[in-house]
Amino acid sequence: MKKLINLISEEVTKAFVSAGYDEKYGKVTLSNRPDLCEFQCNGAMAAAKEYKCAPFMISDKVAALLESDEMFESVESVKPGFLNIKMDTAFLAKYMNDMKDDEGRYGLEKAKKPLTIVVDYGGPHVAQPRHVGHLRSAVIGESVKRIAKFMGHNVIGDVHLGDWGLQMGLIITELRERKPDLVYFDESYTGEYPKEAPFTISELEDIYPTASGKSKSDESFKEAALLATKELQGGRRGYQALLSHIMNVSVTDLKRNYENLNVHFELWKGESDAQPYVPEMVEMMKEKGFAHMSEGALVVDVKEDTDTKEIPPCIILKSDGASLYSTTDLATLVMRMKENNPDRVIYLADARQSMHFIQVFRCARKTGIVPDTTELVHIGFGTMNGKDGKPFKTRDGGVMRLEYLLKEIDDEMLNKIKENQKEKENLNIDEAEAEQTAKTVALAAVKYGDLSNQASKDYIFDIDRFTSFEGNTGPYILYTIVRIKSILSKYEAKGGDISALKDAIMPAVNAGQKNLMLSLAKFNATIESAYEESAPHKICAYIYELANAFNGFYHDTKILSEENEELKKSYISLLVLTKEILEACIDMLGFSAPDRM
């Protein structure tokens, strides 16, 4: 289906051409004065300069040609030369029925040429506790992936774990100090290593911060960790076996954490998976003259003549021959081109890493790792701050673990749901259902609270505001969906057959209903825009508008008590469409709605 605003623009453009003016002046936009009209066209103002006449003379001619068009209730020419447009309610009702008939798509066409897209979530380092800083890449990445999938693309989500580099050497060195008799440290050992890990996830999460702290104050410990890292990367058997244990224990815990966030990956690869591609890649860069030595390091120059600021070379190998994040990211691209051949690779990472990605992307193109046809995108996100405007911390000033934050919000939501039930004197929800509902609503509170902000912006993580049932929040959106579900359930309980409602939506009978229809009609344009700009916040803004439009209609209209059966069916059919579109949108945001709240 064509977007409503495009259909309107086509009609207005035809009128401009028929009146003798260029088609470029027929573009229609949403009205900036919704109290006067629903859409507007300002083309006559620009056309007046070209055709050397008063703007209102042009707008008068165009309005006269559109006067009898069945698409419009009215097209008014307003001085100095604006066209104020109101939609015909019958045309709008037909558009609603067409959206409803397009089951699961609601007027949004799938991509004609599906792309293969890899979404790199920039996952956490293994063996480290997940903290609130890991929230944004997971939540934004999952939504970006789901939006692209809804558009019909083949999307591959890769957690991209940090499982290579100094942190692994730190863990091995600290483990050796704690448990020196483990067989993994005996270089003469040639047998099979134990299948069970010599540590639990709790031990592992204590080992890394302890080791990291030691490396900053104990130079000999740091040297030992650097050596362990080099030996691990050089293929030392015992260390490779330990890496396997670290990965297995960490990934099991990670999967549980990500499951709680309703975040899922098609690939569970780490930086270590790309390491086999490094030697050949480095050799290629040397042979083709892309890489050269600079101050002991192997680098590729990536500056361009058009640069307005200094872009340092991309370092491929340090002076001691060790690889860096840039090396790993480039080798990962080599691997992805070979295994997935993507048309686009999207990276989720802190906005402060933008220089790193400029260097890596330019190096990948210059060296031919990726062709010009493969798009490389960095979605740089801002910081999640506390109410004081500083990075979110625990009450004692530490970095808050993600699972503790989610538990705090679950508890807050459970209390609010119980209070809500008492106020309604509706105590028929048992404890188990209340707890599950609280988890569902809490997840919506967290995700919507994050995603409703433009990704690149810092935002304040305000638990009180995010868990509110009023205002621009996840719980408010879910409450709206639950309200619609309740009305539909009552309709069916009284013998109504929702499945039999075909082309049942009739022209709007009040302003609230028309406003709801106009909001619904923006669905395909909104999702397209959210996909093209990798902007989940646009979907949040849309469903907040849609929820408000529904609630306005609900308060102005007697739905179930309507005596005219055809009109009642029209209302119910419109509610079904509203519910389905809201549910499709929240699914793209990565959460769902309960049946009751």
Question: For the regions a protein language model found, what residue spans apply to each?
Answer:
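Short, charged, solvent-exposed linker or helix-capping segments at domain edges/interfaces
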Residues: 94-99
